[in-house]
Curated annotation (Swiss-Prot):
The gene is trmA. Dual-specificity methyltransferase that catalyzes the formation of 5-methyluridine at position 54 (m5U54) in all tRNAs, and that of position 341 (m5U341) in tmRNA (transfer-mRNA). It catalyses: uridine(54) in tRNA + S-adenosyl-L-methionine = 5-methyluridine(54) in tRNA + S-adenosyl-L-homocysteine + H(+); uridine(341) in tmRNA + S-adenosyl-L-methionine = 5-methyluridine(341) in tmRNA + S-adenosyl-L-homocysteine + H(+). The active site is at residues 323, 357. S-adenosyl-L-methionine binds at residues 189, 217, 222, 238, 298. This is tRNA/tmRNA (uracil-C(5))-methyltransferase. The keyword Cell inner membrane does not apply. Belongs to the class I-like SAM-binding methyltransferase superfamily. RNA M5U methyltransferase family. TrmA subfamily. The keyword S-adenosyl-L-methionine applies.
Length: 365
């Protein structure tokens, strides 16, 4: 991470440079005008991870700066939410004099929400015993006088929870309040306010849809739950068990009645749709009963494999959210043969980095 680049006064210039670069990357495609969704210039990250440095009686957070090729002390961290920045000094001042809690502590992770919850994970190079548990309970109680906080202790093959290992985010999305269960150590959108903009963009481009929606790589149901209002039914797949459990929680708490989550990979689902294989996880689910005219994909950085690209091409409308414009371009080389890009967006999830989160909406030619 290049900490020196994190200067809010240069944010607009850096964002404009990303827009120019993204347009250049997509120059070979017939794209509409780029829609740009900016981030807050500071305190935009809802999660952060720090290593812990021990120096005599002192103890502090640090990160590794790739530009300087050295560790940098982080008493505060500009990208992190205001809640994380408030927690950082409060926590470290309680850890410093506590020989039990600080011993062999090497990392601290924070997961916060816009709605005011924070989860703190303490990672150790030692086994956690009853003495540690007693001190951790006191730490949690003390922090709870100032914060809506939960605490986790982690060591090799150990995970001790006080009192929850998740937070519940509450987001106002297009005038509707949505709640999202976000579990520790699993994927969540890092930039809460930009995540809302992504959801609202996806709702807008699918608002006149008919039939059903298929989503691959649905995670904790982030998009499926928000988009369910635009479709008769939604069928979504996700492989990671914690994410599927979070998605089921989110379906229930948001009272979404037309969304079905299947725990399987996109690759396996592609084979199931092509009737190449049968899967026990699909027992009781009649895939042929779904009338999915729209497909939503938010794949990992590697993009879609060739078979999944062929599957996706079978749908009238494609919503593709990408965390890697290069693999999106690779996929568009095929998708653009059958579909036309009608919406094109940049979501600045990660200010002050080269990372570009983009979205395209494609409709069959």
């Amino acid at each position: 991470m290049n900490l020196a680049a994190m200067d809010p006064t240069t944010y607009d210039v850096q964002l404009e440079a990303k827009c120019v670069k993204l347009k250049q990357l997509f120059a070979d495609f017939d794209t509409p005008e780029l829609e740009t969704f900016s981030s807050e210039p500071a305190h935009y990250r809802m999660r952060a991870e720090f290593r812990v440095w021990h120096e005599g009686e002192d103890l502090y957070y640090y990160m590794f700066d790739k530009e300087l090729n050295s560790k940098v002390r982080c008493d505060q961290f500009l990208p992190a939410s205001e809640l994380i920045n408030k927690m950082m000094p409060a926590l470290v001042e309680l850890l410093k004099p506590n020989t039990i809690l600080r011993h062999r502590l090497f990392q601290i992770d924070f997961l916060s929400t816009l709605s005011g919850e924070i989860l703190v994970s303490l990672l150790y190079h030692k086994q956690l015993d009853s003495e540690w548990e007693q001190q951790a309970k006191i730490l949690k109680q003390t922090l709870s006088t100032q914060f809506n906080v939960n605490l986790i202790g982690r060591a090799r093959k150990q995970k001790i929870i006080f009192d929850k290992d998740f937070v519940v985010e509450s987001l106002n999305v297009a005038g509707k309040q949505l709640q999202y269960h976000q579990i520790e150590n699993s994927f969540t959108q890092p930039n809460g306010k930009v995540s809302v903009k992504m959801l609202e963009w996806a709702i807008d481009i699918t608002k006149n849809s008919s039939g059903d929606l298929l989503e691959l790589y649905c995670g904790n149901g982030n998009f499926s739950i928000a988009l369910a209002q635009n479709f008769e039914r939604v069928l979504a797949t996700e492989l990671a068990k914690p994410s599927v459990e979070s998605a089921q929680y989110n379906i229930k708490v948001n009272q979404v009645e037309n969304l079905q989550i299947i725990r399987m990979s996109a690759e396996d689902f592609t084979e199931a749709m092509a009737k190449k294989r049968s899967f026990r996880r699909l027992e009781g689910i009649d895939l042929d009963s779904y009338n999915c005219n729209t497909i939503f994909v938010d794949p990992p950085r590697a993009g879609l494999d060739a078979d999944t690209v062929k599957l996706v091409q079978g749908y009238e409308r494609i919503v593709y959210i990408s965390c890697n414009p290069n693999t999106l371009i690779d996929n568009l080389a095929e998708l653009s043969k059958t579909h036309k890009i009608t919406r094109f967006a940049l979501f600045d999830q990660f200010p002050y980095t080269d990372h570009m989160e983009s979205g395209v909406f494609l409709e069959k030619k």
